[in-house]
Amino acid sequence: TQLISVEPSYPYAAGRIFYLQTHICDWKDYHATVAFLRQGIAQQQAVISPFEFFNVPASPHEQLMCAESYVLKNYPAQSTPLWNGEIYQHAKIKIAYISADFYNHATSILMIELFEQHDRSQFEIIALAFNSKNDEMTVRVKAAFDRYIDVSQYTDLQVAQLIKSLQIDIAVDLKGHTQDARLGIFAYKAAPIQVNYLGQASTIGASYIDYILADRHIVPPQYHTDFSEKVVCLPHTYYVNDSKRPISSQVFSRGELGLPESGFVFCCFNNSYKISPTMFDVWMRLLQQVPNSVLWLLEGNAT
């Protein structure tokens, strides 16, 4: 807030403040701030990043405008791409999965069995990890790949050069604009095909990302034009999961969880920044209409 008072146009500060306020459900001036941010996006101003704008009530086209403007200002396509149209003569298609989340993180928890189930007779799969965290999930991830390369100390250009030297056919970005993302790697266009998958189920807004893997639920056909990528819809759902993940046998009582012994329990275990005042208003009216009901929320922070 002090920064805004000194330099009102400081890049992305307004969006960051809004994002932090939503983490603690501080909805003071919420609608006025939303209007300000949407106006800024319409005028191609650097008011909010795509990830933070994702939770602003806005149209898919506005999301695209925000992403494209952000990428153009921060991660523009390099003037000379590293891949120049070469056709690799591989016996197997080489796929590189690129992420900071090859540890006990939602991405690996969901994707681990996909890595393990790749048809090795047709594909060679390589992990490029730009986070050096290691845990029991990392051990399983490493075993699932043909090659696992720690690139946490590499620059974006060095990672891109590695992709080119490995003759990767398909580079899959598992981060998008989320935390620890390194979109600058893909700006060098080191692979013939570059794909947006899982980490961010919205457009990256970059001309050098060719496809997004989605489904008809998260990207209905009428919104395909609001993506800079070509939308590839998987059947049923784009979501993967791990069938080997054990399900706990422990059964909790309502009392152990701090819930009343009777009455309907409404639940939302999303992070608090995803809750809007409009949504919360609906919940409150539901509680009024359902006698003895309660709302169970995830406590993301003590505030």
Segments predicted by a language model, with ranges:
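Substrate-binding clefts and catalytic carboxylate motifs of secreted carbohydrate-active enzymes
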Residues: 267-278, 285-288
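Conserved short loop/turn motifs at secondary-structure junctions
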Residues: 20, 271-272, 297-302
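Residues that mark the start of a beta-strand
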Residues: 92-96, 263-265, 294
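A conserved nucleotide-sugar
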Residues: 122-124, 284-303
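Alpha-helical solenoid repeat scaffolds of the TPR/TPR-like class and their adjacent stem/linker regions
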Residues: 1-259, 271, 281
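A generic structural signal for short coil/turn motifs at secondary-structure boundaries
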Residues: 104-106, 274-276, 298
